[in-house]
Amino acid sequence: MSLLENNIRKICKDWKVNSVAADLHCHTKMSDGSASIDEVVLMAKKLGLKTIAVTDHDTFAGATRACVYGRRQGIEVIHGAEISCIDSARGRKVHILCYLCQNPDRLEGVFKRTKERRQRAAALMLQKVMRQYPITPDMVSRRAQGSTNIYKQHIMHALLDAGYTNEIFGDLFRSLFHPREGSAYASVEYPEVTEIVPKIHEAGGLAVLAHPAVYDSYDVMEELLPLGLDGVEVWHPRNHPDDPERLSGFCREHGLIMTGGTDFHGLYTKKPNPLGTCTTGDDQVELMKKRCEKYRKQTPRADKQ
């Protein structure tokens, strides 16, 4: 047994989840998660999860690598990404989960623009933090190693290493990065959500609205229906008690796919949410694949155009 597998065994202990369940919302070190791609796949295997989706922010790189490693470990990895958007009419963030994209290259332009904007914001935030605390770019880069970008969590981890906090999310995080009051906050310009859903379909992917309760996305959920919204993330750790019933009712009324996911970030989370906390049933995973197959027939491959 490798050292990595032994460490994962210790983490997982005896906790098991339903072997037919799928956790369709997982982040890795490729974006703002603390666990590597291999670690996430091995955790899923030890927990008895049959299927996971790797959905790093604004990149398919994590999912592509996870699919390869998942096959070696006997874990089905659904290719995905979580796309950061804005609902400018209401001034709110919106996240769209893209699954099973047939032509991922068609979304690379969107990802590249977001990456560049996020890099500019991260550089500005880091400069502001370094004026207040004696951390260095190398300390932050070490924590961001393997990621497509520097995220606020990486800066906080450097501050934790330096002894200025004992938690990633807490009073110090709020004082630095609160959108209105944070002394080091810098905003990122994101694409309009009404533009992203059609782009996902043009690329042959499924568009699922992520965690509506987190960003109060209920109004935009209705507006995305005419654009062909495929599904809604019904089960999420940050739901309010009545959210699953409300969201599942909406999905049944409009014939939408119902997904569930932990929004796994490892250490980088406000409350402990181990992999498999929220899951998707086998029936919905099969529905996703059937709908994707329909899109596959409708969407010409980029290499055949």
Question: In which residue ranges do the predicted regions lie?
Answer:
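Conserved, well-ordered active-site substructure
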Residues: 273-283
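A short acidic, helix-capping loop that chelates divalent metal ions and anchors anionic groups
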Residues: 106, 269-271
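Extended substrate/RNA-proximal surfaces in nucleic-acid metabolism proteins
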Residues: 2, 6-13, 71-219, 282-303
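An N-terminally biased module of ancient metal coordination in phosphate/nucleic-acid-related enzymes
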Residues: 1-93, 176-181, 185, 191-210, ...
